[in-house]
């Protein structure tokens, strides 16, 4: 967890991210999706952003110029923290991954469609799966309350370089 309070946990996260980067490079992969580690009611959003910006600025020194790390929303209530991290780091090697199913769970206070515009300048990848607005069910695209057609259309229009994965 890049924003962990315990420095040993941050060091472990950095070690695991290095291992992931090395494995990806060995396989010829140029983009990896990572979880940023936000946990509601544990981290103050401002502190999480501040610590994450410091962590990623430091870690990106080890990342090749043609490689992208995309931070995925998992438990964030809105896109604000991830967008603030990407803007604060201000490096094309750090992008964002929108998981539309996660944006449609009980932890999100922002409808999935409303995540796209703020994330668009940094959006590099999108995870597509559906649910009924509470739990992270990873249901088929047509079984849930996420407006998939609108989501895909908005991403293609606002972040045309983003890639997609059906989860």
In which residue ranges do the predicted regions lie?
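Glycine-rich S-adenosyl-L-methionine
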Residues: 144-153
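Conserved radical SAM core fold
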Residues: 1, 39-41, 130-136
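Acidic/histidine-rich catalytic cores of soluble enzymes
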Residues: 53-145
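Short amphipathic alpha-helices and their capping/turn segments at secondary-structure boundaries
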Residues: 16-27, 83-86, 111-121, 152-157
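Conserved residues at the C-terminal ends of beta-strands
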Residues: 35, 129, 167
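Active-site acidic/histidine proton-transfer and metal-coordination neighborhood
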Residues: 2-95
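Conserved, mostly hydrophobic/aromatic
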Residues: 13, 24, 32, 69, ...
């Amino acid at each position: 967890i890049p924003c962990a309070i315990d420095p040993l946990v941050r060091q472990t996260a950095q070690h695991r991210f290095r291992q992931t980067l090395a494995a990806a490079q060995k396989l010829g992969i140029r983009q990896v999706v990572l979880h940023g580690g936000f946990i509601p009611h544990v981290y103050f959003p401002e502190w999480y952003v501040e610590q994450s910006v410091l962590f990623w600025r430091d870690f990106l020194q080890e990342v090749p110029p043609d490689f992208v790390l995309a931070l995925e929303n998992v438990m964030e209530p809105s896109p604000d923290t991830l967008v603030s991290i990407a803007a604060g780091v201000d490096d094309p090697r750090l992008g964002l991954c929108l998981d539309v199913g996660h944006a449609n769970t009980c932890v999100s206070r922002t409808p999935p469609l409303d995540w796209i515009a703020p994330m668009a300048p940094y959006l590099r990848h999108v995870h597509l799966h559906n649910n009924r607005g509470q739990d992270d069910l990873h249901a088929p695209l047509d079984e849930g309350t996420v407006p998939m057609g609108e989501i895909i259309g908005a991403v293609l229009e606002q972040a045309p370089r983003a890639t997609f994965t059906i989860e």
